Amino acid sequence: MTAEIRSVSYRELISGNKNFRNLWLGQIISLMGDWFNLIATAILTANLTGSGLAVGGLFVIRSLAQFVSSPFGGVLADRFNRKKILIWSDILRFFIVLGFLLVKDASQIWLLYTLTALQLGISGIFFPTKDAILPDVVSEDEIGTANALTATTWSTMLALGAFLGGQVAGTWGIAPAIWLDAFSYLLSAYFIAKISYTQTTEKSEEPLRATSVFKLSFQGFGYLSEHKAILILATQKASLMLAVSGFNEVLQVELSSKVFIIGEGGSTGLGWLYAIVGVGTGVSPILARWITGDRERGLRHAITAGYGITLIGLMLMYPITSLELVLAGGFFRGFGVAIIWVFSTTLLLKKLPNKVRGRVFGTEFALLTLAGAIGSGLGGWFLDAFNMSLQNLILL
């Protein structure tokens, strides 16, 4: 009979694990900038084009860029020093984001799309690597706490970053939000550089060629096909992106720019919509984990409950009779989605061997971004091609 693993507290983890603390601080700063950027580019696209399809296209590009790059990111994370990959990803994104300052009118929307593809393509390498390095900088009894804190931080920065990003863009314009996003990457790289990290990935005598990278990237799919229990866990996020989140990306921009217009071009309103989702996603992993602990059975039951809570949120949003009701629906939608997202990741972290961790997380990320692209693309297309109401988009 194996002894039950003790879960450390959040305070113990942050104060006692310097490496995790630096990784976490880098995450806080870069995520804050990311949400500034998303608000800025979404509102800029809506204002320049006035098209739901164009807005949907932005989110399709954001998703597809990560879909293409994330399997290769997983290969790199299993082959090279994960810390260096994270640092260089941040530095490259700093220079790319500054390019958004050049977009001034609708004729340059191609440039906005191109820069978005480059930025999110590198993010598709960064995020699987960040997931893969987490068990390298925490002990086994810290994994559940670290993953919950990481997810809560994402949610908190969604709430705070989206709110502040909306306020900044709505009050002072798009450019300050872009500058803040760019410099957030440099600060993130600084904190990651402070991590004391010894490479745990397996070195190979075979040189890494383009063909071998392509071949290795598909090993994540192969592993999932041979391990059905892992496959179910790894497709939870993709299911959410296809059925819920992809459509809602377009829906929120449409609501803020055409229905509840607050701030310049609806920037402030969009920030509020993202922020309330962030509040829901922030509190739910902590509350749910307080009930379930890190026990596998409890985590699985919570994932099931998360789908029901998500449905409640969508039902509250459906009438679109008031901003308050839409915000309440967004809170519950975020609450349910976060339970599914965080607990499926916790189970994967506990079950995946180190040698395939990067490729499996890369594959998972590819699937969820592809699903998000399909959801966003269909949402924008339905709005423009069929003149679909926002209520019917929620029903879908």
Which residues does each PLM region occupy?
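Pair of pore-lining "gating" transmembrane helices in MFS-fold secondary transporters
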Residues: R11-I43, A117, E226-S245, F331
